[in-house]
Amino acid sequence: MQMKILFLIIIFNIAAIGRLAAEDGSRLWLRFQPQEKESLPSFTQIRGEASSIALQEFQHAWQQMSGSYLPGNGGKNEHTLLIGSLKNREVRRLVKSKELQELGEEGYIIRTMGQGNRRTTVVASTGEAGLLYGAYHLLRLIQTGKYSDTLNISEQPRYDIRILNHWDNLDGTVERGYAGHSIWQWDKLPGDISPRYREYARANASIGINATVLNNVNATPEILTAEYLEKVKLIANELRPFHIRVYLSINFSSPAALEGLENSDPLNPEVQQWWKKKADEIYNIIPDFGGFLVKANSEGLPGPQDYGRTHAEGANMLADALKPHGGIVMWRAFVYNPTGEDRARQAYNEFMPLDGQFRDNVIIQVKNGPIDFQPREPFSPLFGAMRQTALMPELQITQEYLGFSNHLVFLATQWKEFLESDTHCMGEGSAVAKCTDGTLLPHPLTAIAGVANIGLDANWCGHHFAQANWYAFGRLAWDHTVTAEEIAEEWIRMTFSREPAFLEPVREMMLLSWETAVNYMMPLGLHHIFAWGHHYGPEPWCDIPGARPDWLPPYYHNASEEGIGFDRTVTGSNAVSQYCTPVSERFNHIESCPEELLLWFHHVPWDHPMQNRRTLWEEMCYRYDGGVQQVREFQKLWDRMEPYVDSERFRHVQSRLRIQSRDAVWWKDACLLYFQTFSGMPIPYDIERPVHELEELKQIKLDLKHHN
């Protein structure tokens, strides 16, 4: 009997050989898988301050990869890893002080010196934050198999503040969140401090993110009460060792709501005094508090315009309250009203007249495009135009308009297109990135924000591949010159596998995924044709009686028997005039307008000849169908990857790709059948036929109010 049991155990173990252990994705890109000794650096000892978070983090990772900690000063000195600042005499001997000081407290040097049996790899910085970022960079090289014994790396961040915006509510829900409830778990604080806070901090620090806004921009005044400030303090305590500062979104009417003041007028001395006292209170509790994020006079929220004041007057009042403590105000430019004016023009029209009127500790936070995180938008014309005021880009990591956490969409390609867009506002080469990182327009503050896609789901982001967008935001915030290809490869190597048979096809899938989603959702510059409210799926026919026109798809697509698209030329809304020359000219003329943005700027006849000689209608059909077919190719590709992925993550991604494939057909059928009622043209016969009836699709109403 015992022999039989032993035999069964042996058979089971043989069957298990080659099968990868299941993973839930909770370790993100910080898996630090065990490696063969030959594939690890030849470090024989580590030196530095034992209390340094950088040294501790490196040792924590090294132990997982090698099975043991590196010895300290007592170890062999054949290959020493030295992690230290200019306070360390050995660092001063190996690295020039001026060289380090020019990189600032967040910059670092990684350099290997010596040869043979006497080598030293030094990670050096003038600040503890720089040491931490340098240690993570070294770990990234080891994880990705890119480490060498000839390292000579010098880096510093492109943006000073690299910040996540959490749209998390105090009741635990997350607006536009698709990965579970809020990780902050306000109801359990102060008694229960989740270990996830430290894991969150570690993940962010590993990619250079140094700030976070804890609560929704649609803020409630309660966040500024003593009860919640104590909870914020506890979160800040967990994030601080990883050099992450905490910020809060505030409600502009807080003085009236919390103190019972007659109003919240920014020119009211009582209101000004209330904010100064509140700032004093916050900094007494959280000495390194970062400042406020403000959404004002937008989508029904209160703001200075309620009292006849300007955005500058509102922002400056808050800035004055924060100034003595070193705090800043991030004032959002996402403003629009249900007027007759083109929504795409409104932020520019409200903020351009205020250029130069903001305090130096105010920075205007501007969404990448002029509408609202659409699958593809042109860059906002504010970038490069406001030269006397600091501007920061706001990107959306969470996929509000790109399939939630059901669709695989790698956003680094979208963000690279945006950051590299040439505004021409200071001549050729005036890319958005250079207009905002201090290169062309020096300001005391530079920053970039990303709306987080993080929740309580085990894998943090709902979809395993959505983790790549969190990672990509951090990498681009640190260095916007890194390519999307490099980011994808790093993430795949750390999160899944280094195997070329896995790495290369999956990287290609990621790089194609954004354009694929644009094609099956809103190609050729179409925008805002999604379902009412929750924004999941197509609803180009949506018409809600009494609703604001600028919340309805027909406002944007303007489909008729004559054609489709929004005329923003000089003979239309004239939104093109907000761009600098020659960009404005290029967008204005249908012959020179990029086809990817054609229907954003032009109302185009259905039979308009495209560059490939197809008509507009035909090209639209082929774009939608191409998106569908590409997702199906993703499915086939992923199925071939099964030998390289653990079963849990493989099945999860496989299941999500099935949803994405069905959704792509839904989008294609809905949009082509609906727009065909205007064009009156046949769908090209070599394209897969619709499988739905239009009236059937119009009946779809999803209840997604509580998706998280």
Give the ranges of each region predicted by the language model:
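Feature activates predominantly on carbohydrate-active enzymes
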Residues: A50-E57, A61, S97-L293, K323, ...
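Catalytic-core regions of glycoside hydrolase
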Residues: K188, A226, L234, G260-E489, ...
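Acidic, contiguous N-terminal accessory segments
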Residues: N13, L20-G116, D149-T150
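Bacterial N-terminal signal peptides
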Residues: F7-A16
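Catalytic domains of carbohydrate-active enzymes that cleave complex glycans
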Residues: S430-N708
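Structural motif
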Residues: I46-S52, L82-N88, A124-T126, D168, ...
